[in-house]
A protein has these predicted regions:
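Conserved hydrophobic positions within beta-strands
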Residues: 41-43
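OB-fold/S1-family single-stranded nucleic acid-binding modules
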Residues: 102-130
C-alpha cells in the first residue's frame, strides 16, 4: 500500500503545481466581461491557428479614421469541430463581431463566449457557438 501512495501523492502534487499557470492562460482579466461590444467592419486576415484563431478587422471609426481590430476566438481544433476551417472568413468579408473588449482600450475583442458571434452584413451568423 505504501508503495502506491507515494507515487499518487507525487502526481497529485505535480498537478497542483501546473494548475495555476494553466488557468492563468485562460484568464479573462484583460477583457471587460461585464459588457459586450459590437464591431462592424471588413476582414483583412483570418488566422486559423492555435492556441486561438484570430480575425483581423478594419473598422471605420467615429472620426473617419480606420481602426485595426483583432478578435480572438477559440482554437482551430474547437472551430473545426463546429464545421469551420481556414476558409470560413476571407479578406474583404463584411462582418459584425460581438465580444468582450480589451480593458486597456485597445482594439481587441475576446470571443470565447456563447453569446458572441461573427455575422455577415445581413446578420447571418457565420461563426457563433464555437467562439
Amino acid at each position: 500500500m505504501k508503495n502506491k501512495v507515494l507515487p499518487l501523492l507525487s502526481v497529485g502534487f505535480g498537478l497542483l503545481l501546473v494548475s495555476g499557470p494553466l488557468s492563468a492562460h485562460h484568464g479573462k482579466g484583460a477583457f471587460d466581461m461585464e459588457n459586450l461590444t459590437i464591431v462592424k467592419g471588413t476582414v483583412t486576415k483570418f488566422e486559423f491557428i492555435n492556441p486561438h484563431a484570430l480575425i483581423y478587422i478594419d473598422v471605420m471609426g467615429d472620426k473617419g479614421n480606420v481602426e485595426h481590430w483583432i478578435a480572438e476566438s477559440s482554437s482551430n481544433n474547437h472551430l473545426s469541430r463546429g464545421g469551420y476551417d481556414k476558409n470560413s472568413l476571407k479578406p474583404g468579408d463584411q462582418v459584425i463581431v460581438t465580444g468582450h473588449r480589451a480593458k486597456n482600450g485597445a482594439y481587441g475583442l475576446e470571443l470565447q463566449c456563447k453569446e458572441c458571434s461573427v455575422a455577415d452584413s445581413q446578420n447571418k451568423v457565420l461563426l457563433g457557438y464555437y467562439f
